[in-house]
Amino acid sequence: VEHPDAEDFNNAAALPTDPTWFKHAVFYEVLVRAFFDANADGAGDLRGLLGRLDYLQWLGIDCIWLPPFYDSPLRDGGYDIRDFYKVLPEFGTVEDFVDLLNAAHERGIRVITDLVMNHTSDSHPWFQESRHDPDGPYGDYYVWSDTAEKYTDARIIFIDTEESNWTFDPVRKQFYWHRFFSHQPDLNYDNPAVQEAMIDVLRFWLELGIDGFRLDAVPYLFEREGTNCENLPETHAFLKRVRKVIDDEFPGRVLLAEANQWPADVVEYFGDATTGGDECHMAFHFPLMPRIFMAVRRESRFPISEILAQTPEIPDMAQWGIFLRNHDELTLEMVTDEERDYMYSEYAKDPRMKANVGIRRRLAPLLDNDRNQIELFTALLLSLPGSPVLYYGDEIGMGDVIWLGDRDGVRTPMQWTPDRNAGFSKANPGRLYLPPSQDSVYGYQAVNVEAQRDTSTSLLNFTRTMLAVRRRHEAFAIGTFEELGGSNPSVLAFVRQVSEDGDTVLCVNNLSRFPQPIELNLQQWSGCTPIELTGQVEFPRIGHLPYLLTLPGHGFYWFQLTGCEEDA
């Protein structure tokens, strides 16, 4: 099976090497298919995304994260890859992708994408060769067995659709292993040739100029009898190999782990802390997200406090990625059964809103389109420890279309204008890959970029302002996190501080729908003056007594603590 080399293409100009850019970055997840359709065929494409980079630069994001855009039969949203070296034809070509990289880099925006390392599509030439020629060069590229009785301790991830992790292949007359759908056979990482082949894929895109990868489904690369086949030492050893390739050949590029596990397990994916981390630079903090929703619904800071207290220290060169919503369902794997029932009853009253172990909604409808709550959630996302990941459309409060199947309800076209097709495409409306929302509250006539850009008080302009404030204060990106407790359980207060005398930010969040008072012990900052960051208003100087603040329902404050030398 032949594949092209990066030398066959013009490679993109790289941004200056900055080994810590990801710690300061705000990420924006955008589905190529959903953003903008440049060739009027009804689906978004790479040229369309390129034409909308000015909007993303105006909004103030630092890095675009693209889910897979590789050639695929699209039975799992592109996570079933048929050719790692080709772009899905409806999105464009590899040349289009290089043009996108160049245009993004000119605007100071980086681009990362998903790389699915665990499995391929069953239509990938490697798998077809493996089925038809067991003794050939690809015979050992996948995990084959004469029996389906191996690795019985591994859970089934897609409980809605799959009965077993083994599927019988009538051609080879053996079973093949798959942790996800049966049309996604797992690669066999015990075969050194597979490891080399996947490192070649990484090199190809890195040489073209991509800024990094989110490694999809990393815990499952290896299988061992008597284990649950997740987080195995062999998997970590392979990730160290991948990181070494990055460090040696492509410094400044980033690996982001997608490991939907508890924080104590995820920390392992940063690697050896004594070296500052020698595996992935970043990992998503999955359990934090449902607990932000629980804390606000219960009007109590404890769900957030507890999960942050259970989150171990991470290596110096590592960073969490945090998010409120993304292209999947709001995952509830990382909560207890009781908490899951609570979340379903509060946030998914219609059974069509459920998917696998989670809730299939966008941010605004999850929060009943309550502007105060949306602003509070945005403030938490931008101030809690980690690099925030925004999901396209949430900055304008897009809704979901729950009658679309599977996860498509949260993957509808970006709403640019009140015109036909939401300004997303000039195609005949019947040709669109999915219909834009026509809802009376969330439809594109009511919710769109054009209207919100022109309205100073819009959610879009609020989000842009908050991103600008965050960029001015590196405490949000790299500061330590210290929770302050306080007299009122409905209020979450914390300090982010770069160093003893560095940038210091105090964040106070009212998780209740009613106004709340809070008395905070700020003695160690006595003599400082809090300056509110959105309006630059000075608040009373901090003394030795408890500091009283009152907050409106779902209100929040971001303060910079200044002038601390002149101790009271």
Q: Model-flagged regions — what are they?
A:
Residues V1-A568:
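Active-site and adjacent substrate-binding regions of carbohydrate-active enzymes
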